[in-house]
Amino acid sequence: MATGRQFDLPFMVEQWDDTDSHVEELIALTGDYRVARAAFEEAVKRRPGRIVTLRQKTRLLADSRSLK
């Protein structure tokens, strides 16, 4: 049952399509930066060659393409 409570979950880990035009999968959504960073690092390992980003709302914090 919904309690009507709102959560602030600003950190997102997303996998993008090969043309970087849209999100294919929301991998993680959390309010904790350390959890988001760990999810990002694991997603990059499990999805070699794919575009994975870590964002805080609209701010880009990490991109798998910059790790090469």
Regions found by a protein language model. Give the residues of each.
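Short, ordered coil/turn segments that flank beta-strands lining enzyme active or ligand-binding pockets
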Residues: D18-H22, R34, Q56
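Local beta-strand/beta-hairpin segments that build beta-sheet-rich folds
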Residues: E24-A28, L61-D63
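Short, mixed-charge low-complexity intrinsically disordered segments
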Residues: R46-K68
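A short, charged, amphipathic alpha-helix used as a generic interaction element across diverse proteins
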Residues: T30-G49
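Short linear motifs at secondary-structure transitions and domain/linker junctions
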Residues: A2-R5, L26-G31, A38
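Short aromatic-glycine-(Arg/Gly/Cys) micro-motifs in beta-strand/loop hairpins
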Residues: M1-E24
